[in-house]
Structure formats: C-alpha cells, structure tokens
Amino acid sequence: MYRCRPEKGFGFCRHSPGEKKPHYLGGYPSIAPPVLLRENGVFGGLDGSLYVVPLSGNGKTWSFKTAFGCPISAPAAVCDGKIYFGCEDGYLYVLGPEGKALLPQKNLQLSKIRSPLKGEMSDPEFNWYSNYGNVSNTNANDQDIAPPLKISWIRRVEGTVKHLPVCGGGRMYTHTAEGQIFAVEQETGRLLWRRYWPEVYLSFTSPIYWQERLLVPQAGMRKSMIRCLDASTGKLIWEVPFTGSPSWSRQAPPVIYKNLAIYASGSGKYAAQGNDKAFIFSGTPLEPLGDMEIMSWMYTHNNPYYPKDNKPLIWAWNVETGEEVWKKDFSHIGLGGNDCGLCLMDGKLYYSTFFGYSSSQKKRRGLPSEPNGLTMAIDPATGDVLWTTTKHYLTAGCTLSGRDGRLYLGGYNQPDESTDERYILCLDARDGSLIWKSDPVKSAVNVVSVGEKFIFSNAIRGDGHLFDRETGKIVSRFNNNYACTRFSLSEPYLLGANLDMVDLSDDYKLVSTGPAIDSRECLGSTVSNGRIFYNSQASGLQVSLLCGPEADSFTVPWKK
C-alpha cells in the first residue's frame, strides 16, 4: 500500500505485509493522495512542488516547483503523457514533454476575504480568539445562542486537531498536530491560506489571534518554535525557540499583554519513549542511560515526579519583533514546568505549575521533596513576582482560569501523597489565599469553565460538575460517558463532542446533537460571533452552524 504523510521523512511511503514500519520512497510531506503509474508515484507536496517518485525506492525523484510555493493538496491526474494538477495558488498546471509555457506571474490573492462575516455579532468583541476563549481562560461566553441549529458549511480537514476553533478577523484558524496552520472564511469555510513547517511532532497546541497577528506554538522533539504569522496571509513575521513538551493537554497558546507575547513551558530531554515509568505513557521504559533522564514526548497523566532537568520557564517576547524582553526560571523552587498554565486578569499575569505529588519518591531520587507546585502573580511588563504560594497549584492536565478577582485551578493528579482525592481550588487573586476547595472530583481536566452564571468542570470518563460560586460545593452533576472532551460554555449551554448542546439551566437536558462527524470525543465546539464552530479531532471535518432566527431563515445548501 502506498500513501502520503504530512510528516518529515514520510512524504511518499510504502507499507508492506510483515513490516511494522513504512518505507520512505521520496518527496516532501504531503496531504494529497498519490497517483500510481506503472513505475512511479505522482503527488503534490505541502511545499508547492509536484513529485514523481520511483515505486521501487531506487532512482532519482523528479520534481516541479509551482509559481508561488503554495501547497498542492488535491490528487494529480495523468493522461496521454501529461500531468494535470491544481494548486492552492488557484492555478491549474499541465506538464508535458514539450511544455514551454511560463509560470504565472499574477498572485490571485485567494487569501483575501470575499464573504465578510455577517450577523449582529460580527464585531471583534465577540471573537473566540484563543483556545479558552480569551486570555483569562474563562472558556465561556454568552451570545444568546439557541436552537434550532443548521449547518452553514462543512469542509474537509487533512490532519489531526486537538484544540478548539479559534476565530478573528472574519477567519477561523486551525493548527494540526503535524505542523499545518491554515485559515478559512468564517462565513463560508473557504480556504484562505495554508502553511506548513516540518519537524512538528504531535503538537496539540492552539493558535491565538491578536490584532491581525496569529501566534502558534509548534513543538517537536528536535526543535520547538513560537511562530508569529500575518493572520491575513499566513506570512511568517518572526519565530523564536522554546523548550519542553506540551504533551497531551497543554493546548494553550501564548497570552498577549499590550506589546508582549508571554508563554510558559518546561525543558529537558525527550524521545518517543522515556526511560522511567513516570516519564512514559504506555509500554516498557527504555533502558537507563547512566544518570540521563529522558521523558516521552507524550507522557503519562500520573505524575509523581519529573526529570531533574525539567525547569519551569516563562518567556516574554515583543509581539511586533519577537525580541526577548524577559525570561524567568523558577527551578530554584521546584522541578517540572510542562504541566503549567498562564492567564491574564486585571493587568496581572498568573502562573501555576506542578512538580509532582510524591514527596517521598522525589526525596529518594535526590530531588527537592517540597513543594509539589506553585502559583504566583507576576507583573507582565517586567516579569517581577508579586506574590507566590506553594500551598495551592495546578495538578497537571489543566490550565488556570481567572474571573472577577478569583483564580480557578484543577488537574489530573492528587495534590500530595496524603490523599487520592482531586479538588478544584478557588484562590483570591490579590494574594493567592484559598477561598474554597471543592468537594472531591475524579479529576478536573483541560480548564475550569467560569461563566457569569455557571462554574463547570469535567473529569475524564467521569462526571461533569457544576459548583456553587461561593462555597465550591457540587450543586449538580451529570455523566454522558464523555472521554477527555474539551467542552466550552456559551451560557446556558455546555458545548460538547459531535455538537452536543446541553442546557445547564434545565437539568442537563440535551437540546441538540449532531451531525456526529467525529469518531472521537476529544473536542467540543465553540461559539464565536454568534455562530457555532467545530473541529473533529480524528475524522477530518470542520463545520459551522447557524443558531436561532438566523438558522430559521437559512436554507441549507443541499436543499437550494
């Protein structure tokens, strides 16, 4: 079997019976289906070149570069000695042995919006512009959505996505785990531009839109970069390196404060498989390499300790130039850093990270036994620490959120060895003191959603909970057997996988569902500019839905 893959070293490859690994034949990473000839495979690459590759794996690969370097995402056709293919630059190319035509010179400006966003909520204040909706990570809004719902558009996605839809400037932006970044019109779903960087590896990170800039952490085992793009064209403006692994659950992009982009991560050595049970996700750890500690790129949600070279780091860069303005290293307090969160509220930056719950195991390994984590307030302009607490902190797999002078922290792990319970914490943002600790929960994953009316958190394959705002008591719960779903909240509705719409004000009534376009349950939908947007995580589709009166007056395309 022959196929293309959007991964460096696997542009065009062959799978053979009895062989566990595919054999790379040639060409650049691609999302286009290959066409097989007698002796060659023909396909277009994400670099804008057409490739003709010998099926034998021997011999020279031939390539043709298109005019503007835009990706080729559709299959080519071969007939009567000619190759026909379309490119995302808008041109149809025909190649043949006697071809003498010049390459096109005119850029067709396909990245320009042709169908501006419509509706009463088309203004920027209604954008869902980050994975958690805003830089406070409330993961919530209220845009008066209501049934009925109708599909406005649906389109194919060639890649794996694990972040919620991000919107701004009339566009929806997507980052695939394999390194693509692309934008489509919010109004129609038409592709505007697509960019690709190799060596991105299982990077489930989200973009953030900010004043016609798009910032995206693109992580890989060989190198990781924060990239700043022109949101209207996808053109790279600047890029800077960072360290650490976002792993499964840190979708968070940088937060933006005035002219600064601020990001938190860890450090250390990584491979596909780590060399300690606490550093891997599954399988057998690698053999120890002396004192060297290696963490799996995708590691476990059970985190008793972290490698000794994992440092909690924060960077701040000038959002216009990428120049580093300040950097902080908190490894003098503890070791960890990947399982962290950042949020902005009322002009202050809040940071929390986890160092592992097992003080006894850390002590035996020669690591600082305490603390197990930290939370702090920081002056975002300078990086100066305003207050620190090591009593209360995230416990991995969850960011922190802020609203109305309060911080909300969750996580996968127990906070320490004295308990197997997990809790949500509410802190006073003025000094980090504890306002309340919730009733026990199985876990609190991704983010605590904090709306004007509701505070919601869900556990992986467990209950979803609503909490009393003043006490943290669980006031109601439900369980539809969701997995690690990244819900969002558009009050009074909770938006889940496959466009489930759950009314939190009416005993968790499921008021709408579908179309069921995803075989997984990792992602919920979001509401931006009065519309619902949804990325399927594993089934390769994106969809936009209209709501209420707008849906009532809309005729779906297949009935026109």
Question: What is the predicted role of each segment?
Answer:
Residues 1-5, 12-14, 21:
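Cationic, amphipathic, low-complexity alpha-helical segments enriched
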Residues 48, 59, 90, 179, ...:
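Glycine-centered loop/turn positions within well-structured domains
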